[in-house]
Amino acid sequence: MVLDKKTIAMASGANYAAFTTLFKDGSPQTHIMWVDTDGEYLLINTEIHRAKYLNTTNDKRVNVMIWKHDDTFKFVEVRGKVVDEIQGEEAFENIQSLSNKYWNKPYPFPVQTERIVLKIEAEREFFFNLKDEDFDF
């Protein structure tokens, strides 16, 4: 499924996301995350020792809800699945880019294991109070 231009705009801006994965027993786990996009997929950067990553090795289904930083009643919910991963230098460069996007400075924390970017393919998108007029396309 091709991402809607509103979803691309939300993921490209400094808007936070609630990222939900599933434990082996099916119970959900949600974290507030930085989010990105390559125009085709949503991108979530984490480390390989984190539960959110380990959960996706067992169950690829995820949910990403991105809200506007200046109006939390405007958001998009994306239901999808992890279809690929980016590792190594490209994943490290992505966390630096995200840190600059959200904090205007380099990523300040040490990497404990290895950075990884989860590529998420959208299966459904739901919009709440988001209109094309909310963006400069």
Task: List each language-model region with its residue ranges.
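Short beta-strand segments
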Residues: A14-I48, T56, N63-I66, E77-V78
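A short beta-turn/loop motif at secondary-structure boundaries
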Residues: D25-S27, H69-T72, V111-Q112
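Extreme N-terminal tail/first-helix region
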Residues: M1-A17, F137
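Short secondary-structure boundary/capping segments
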Residues: I8-A9, W34, L54, Y107-P110
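Charged, gly/pro-rich active-site loop segments
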Residues: V2, K74-F137
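Short, surface-exposed beta-strand-loop junctions and turns on beta-sheet-rich folds
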Residues: R50-K52, D71, D134-D136
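Short, solvent-exposed aromatic-acidic interface loops
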Residues: I48-A51, Y102
